[in-house]
Every structure is written in C-alpha cells, then in structure tokens.
Amino acid sequence: MPPRKTRSSAKSNKHSDADAHLNEGSDDVAQRKTGKRKRSAAVKGDVENKNDDDACKPSYSRWLMKSEPESRIENGVDVKFGIEDLKALPNQTGCWDGVRNYQARNFMREMKVGQQAFFYHSNCKEPGIAGLMKIVKEAYVDHTQFDKKDVHYDPSSKADNPKWHMVDVQFERMVKRFIPLAELKKYHLEHRVKGGPLKDMALFTRARLSVQPLTAEEFEFVLSLENEDPI
C-alpha cells in the first residue's frame, strides 16, 4: 500500500504503479507507491464500461493487489513499495494510493473493512505472492491526484469531482513460502485444460490490472499452496 513516496535523485528503479503495467512473463505488473509509490496510468483497454448494470456484477470479498518491491525512479521519485515497506509503517498500515485505472479503482470501491488481499510483488526478478493484508479503511479520495509534485498527479481530476480513490491496508502475515508467478501460471494452464479453481484467475485473464478480485475458491487454493512443495 502506499504510504508516501521518496524523492530521490536517480537510483534504482522500481515501480510506478499505474494500473497499467508491464507484462511479467505472461502477466503483469502493476505499480504503486506507498506513501512512496503507487500506480499510475490507466490502460484504455482496462477501463470498465461505466454503463454496466451493477446488478449483473459479481460480488467479491477477496483480492490480489500488486506493488513493486524493487527500487524504480519515476520523475525523481522512488516508487518502490514491497511488503517489507508495509510492515515497517506505523501499525503496519498504509494507504494504497496512486491507482490510475478505472476498473482497478472500481474494485477498490467495492472493498470492505476486514476483507483480505494477497500482497503481490510485481515488476521484479521473481514476481509472486509475498503475504496477506487486510482492508482497514474503505475507499476514500486519493489525495495524490491533486499533488503536482506527485508522480500520480492528474490535472484532469477536480477537488469537487475527484476521479481516484484509495483504501487503507494493514499487514497480516507473510505466506509460509513465497508463491511465484511461474508456479501459479502452471496451475492456471493445467486448470484450463483439466478444470480447476485457477482456470479463470484474473492474474492471467486480466493481467494488466494491479487490483484484482478473487473468488473464494481461487483464494483458498492459492493460500493452500503455502503448505505444499513448489512445483
């Protein structure tokens, strides 16, 4: 989650989290900043149709949220924010700011206090699930959209009609073992052929999104992998 960003001269790079992102292998990479980082630009193809009938939309209560654990400088700001950065914040809590994709934003608007999310490391040497966090504050206005010095400043957003929102998250725990993207992809491909909970997982079907919903079956299956040997 992003707390605040660190201004820097030029150093390692990491992540700009705009909800657009790079493809990690077959997937994605959203960036974000944590107080120091967050997500940035929106990908047109990911923008949700605002006219969709809400009544037809499925309801989710579990999530996967991506952030960059390795340093990356964007406009003089290090957008790095990994799970260790979240753990280091007061009360191990921070705001997930910088999301600049409509669909990802809309998913955050659906989040409720107490719901769980996987902290996913993206745009790094080994992307994958690092730990668990929970939502501790529901969607509210993301102040970084109005800050001209912020990497995620959006001049088209107005104070009386803000476009972007964020939630607060709190670290819960690390997974017993890091669950890499490569392993998840193997299960996804297998489940597409033979059937299984990860056959339609958004990590692969909507890879560009930095904030993704999970079904109960997907969440429980992925979490169970921490007790299994890597494949």
UniProtKB/Swiss-Prot annotation:
Listed A to Z, the keywords are: Nucleus, Phosphoprotein
Give the domain of life: Eukaryota
- Which Gene3D superfamilies does this one have? ph1033 like domains
Task: Please state where this protein is localized.
Answer: Nucleus
**A GO CC term?**
nucleus
Q: Tell me which InterPro entries the record gives.
A: 5hmC_binding, EVE_domain, PUA-like_sf, THYN1-like_EVE
**The protein's role, per its UniProt record:** Specifically binds 5-hydroxymethylcytosine (5hmC), suggesting that it acts as a specific reader of 5hmC.
Q: What is this protein called?
A: Thymocyte nuclear protein 1
